[in-house]
Swiss-Prot record:
InterPro entries: aa-tRNA-synth_II/BPL/LPL, BPL_LPL_catalytic, Octanoyltransferase, Octanoyltransferase_CS
Database matches in Gene3D superfamilies: Bira Bifunctional Protein, Domain 2 (3.30.930.10)
Domain BPL/LPL catalytic residues, every copy: 28-210
Name of the protein: Octanoyltransferase
Note: In the reaction, the free carboxyl group of octanoic acid is attached via an amide linkage to the epsilon-amino group of a specific lysine residue of lipoyl domains of lipoate-dependent enzymes.
Organism of this sequence: Maridesulfovibrio salexigens (strain ATCC 14822 / DSM 2638 / NCIMB 8403 / VKM B-1763) (Desulfovibrio salexigens)
Site, as annotated: Lowers pKa of active site Cys: K137
Length: 214
């Protein structure tokens, strides 16, 4: 597993990088990769749609410096912005016990353990994907799979500035609202800090031999 920090990168460029790596993994010319990054403001739609859950016009969204993008991930509508850590694992799961369901569970587990490292008690919520702190959604998960290789992944709210979420009905769940690690911890935490911890916890959850690569 190679860990790659892409910094702040547009959604389309990150998707291109994922698909290129997915092809390489499929062909056996590259190892699995975990991409950690942030996106400029963007609202993304999953395979379940979600445009009906955009609460403002696309023109108004553009005035906020954001756009709407259709993706191949699972799930409904969500948003990304600087101050939110995004994690895209491109990895084979065909030989992992439990398949896609276990992969999904382990991604949630990694996020829960990461939050705990900062003193925040997060948990799963039955019937509602992702990771929650009480009624607040800390982390959204939506993956794509091609020939048992994953792409897309997870977004983890770090900064307390989450105003872009005001433009959507989060994941199409009426009454759901976002929260962030900084808000729950009562102090501002940087995405760089969270990336480092997430990478460590991912290694513990998914494999005993994961080694970070620059």
């Amino acid at each position: 597993m190679e860990f790659i920090d892409l910094g702040l990168i547009p959604h389309g460029e990150a998707e291109r990088i994922q698909l290129e790596r997915l092809k390489q993994v499929m062909e056996g010319t590259a190892e699995d990769a975990l991409y950690l990054l942030e996106h400029p403001p963007v609202v993304t739609l999953g395979r379940q749609g979600g445009l009906e859950n955009l609460l403002i016009s696309e023109e108004a969204l553009k005035a906020m410096g954001a756009e709407v993008v259709q993706t191949a991930r699972g799930g409904n509508i969500t948003c990304h912005y600087p101050g939110q850590m995004v994690v895209y694992p491109v990895m084979r799961i065909e030989k992992r016990r439990g398949g896609i369901k276990k992969f999904f569970f382990d991604m949630e587990e990694t996020a829960i353990r990461t939050a705990a490292r900062f003193g925040v008690q997060a948990a799963r919520s039955e019937g509602r994907p992702g990771v929650w702190v009480g009624p607040g959604k800390l982390c959204s998960i939506g993956i794509g799979v091609k020939k048992w290789i994953t792409y897309h992944g997870l977004s983890f709210n770090v900064s307390s500035d989450m105003k872009l979420f005001d433009a959507i009905t989060l994941c199409g769940l009426h009454g759901a609202h976002p929260t962030s690690l900084s808000r729950e911890a009562g102090k501002e935490i940087s995405t760089e800090e969270v990336k480092n911890v997430f990478r460590e916890e991912f290694g513990k959850v998914f494999t005993d031999t994961a080694v970070a690569a620059s």
